[in-house]
Amino acid sequence: MRRIALAALAVLAVSALSAPTATAAEGWQPVGSDRARPLDESQGLASVERDGQTTFRYTGVGTIDPALAVQGWNHIGDPGAGDGYYVEPYQRDDRGAKLYRVEAPDGSRANYTHELESWEAPNNSFAAVSPDARWLVTGEWGTMDRLLVLPMPGVAMTDPDANLPYASSIQLDRPVRDVQGCDFVSATSLLCSSDDPEGSLFGTTKPLLQVDLSAPVGDEDVTGTVTSHGQLPLESACSGEFETEGVDYDERDGTLRVVVLSPGVCLVSDSKTWRLQRG
């Protein structure tokens, strides 16, 4: 996952001759947007429901826990939430492990580490909590034909000192590229944002993907059928390369939120969290 460098905030100029306008992902229509701050709202978001109240928690460079940063955990991905639990995925530059910072419904926190399998990429792009809050789906960077499934830390695994083990995988029927975030829509369906810059896999860059599962995730592999809903909204006063980030599906009203970072200096001024609903 491409990181937000602080140097990007000091870029002096960028071409704004042909500002792209928002497009609609097929089947999903933009209904509004909010400015996404690049320091603390640039990696993703999760809707956390507790005691009948829903709050939106964002991640970015500025939300990295300082205590974890000094230990080398220098990147945070798209968070996930379910049943009052909130999970932040962390990665570091070595291949030692991945870390999941879990906040329980009572506000207590614990850190769980997952030792990499021999074949596993070190990237920790996102965390998606299954509807029953028993499993955690997570993803790697690059071109992949799988998503990974772990026991839900804090629920199915309650010892932070023990390794959070690999449980199973979602075997995709076609490859995906640079998936930045996923969230469950139902027990057998996820929506995912792809930052694919090439467009060769689904006929467009930056697609919104749907993954339909053969069965709910668990300790056995399941298959996932991937379809594209087209390109996510790209709109900025600047032209250049956008970066799609994490997603959240709000079950209350069926709103999908996705963070899209603008090119160049517009990263600061008009990056957005888009709100989409089924058209």
State where each predicted segment sits.
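Blade-loop segments of beta-propeller domains
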Residues: G62-A97, N111-E117
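Conserved beta-strand position repeated once per blade in WD40 beta-propeller domains
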Residues: S42-S47, I76-D78, F126, V179-G181, ...
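Surface loop/turn motifs at the tips and blade-to-blade linkers of beta-strand repeat domains
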Residues: S33-D40, L68-G72, H114-A121, I170-P175, ...
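Secretory targeting and sorting signals
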Residues: M1-A24
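Structural motif
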Residues: T55, T63-A67, D94-V102, T143-P153, ...
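Conserved blade-ending motifs and adjacent loop-strand segments that build the rim/top face
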Residues: D219-E251
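Loop/turn-rich, solvent-exposed surfaces of beta-rich toroidal or solenoidal domains
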Residues: R174-T225
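Beta-strand-rich domains and repeat architectures in extracellular enzymes and scaffolds
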Residues: G32-V61, V70-D78
